Amino acid sequence: KEAKKIMPSASNLKVFWGDLHNHCNLTYGHGDMRDAFEAAKGQLDFVSVTPHAMWPDIPGANDPRLKWVIDYHTGAFKRLREGGYEKYVKMSNEYNKEGEFLTFIGYEAHSMEHGDHVALNYDLDAPLVECTSIEDWKEKAKGHKVFVTPHHMGYQGGYRGYNWKCFTEGDITPFVEMYSRHGLAESDQGDYPYLHDMGPRPVSYTHLRA
């Protein structure tokens, strides 16, 4: 009610609240997948509980110091492909209730070169699309009802920050992420700085310098 007084709408569109990037221990994250759906159902209108799916250009293969990092990630990707994804799709369908609470199939891909991206599918039986790069992923997505959008764009380029040289606005990527739990990608001076172990947000990779 207060929002309508401050910013009245000229249309009859409604506001819905959701979370389109929510991790759990299906791959690497915290908490049971069912708990994630239950928590979302209790307070939101829609959700995508998003597994980590791939990292085509994961570095460090020849560095024994990084073996544990590689094993941590690739082990999760393997679990997803050995029954985890099917369980995820089944539970997403279980919680999807038209007119009450909507679920979306999504998954995340990491990339040193292009930056991390998230797929958000319209179809509740969407397959896990394998790719050799983010550009390959976008090419394979053509003709499907799916968005492939950049995530935590403000990190350093070349280390999972977004590669703006590859940005093309269109049906596959109609929007980009401004906020996430990582922080604000708009500016290096804005609130909510990037505090993850991938480093700070250099101004050259934020939205204002795109």
Language-model segments: residues:
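Extended, charged catalytic domains and RNA/DNA-binding interfaces, predominantly
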Residues: 1-208
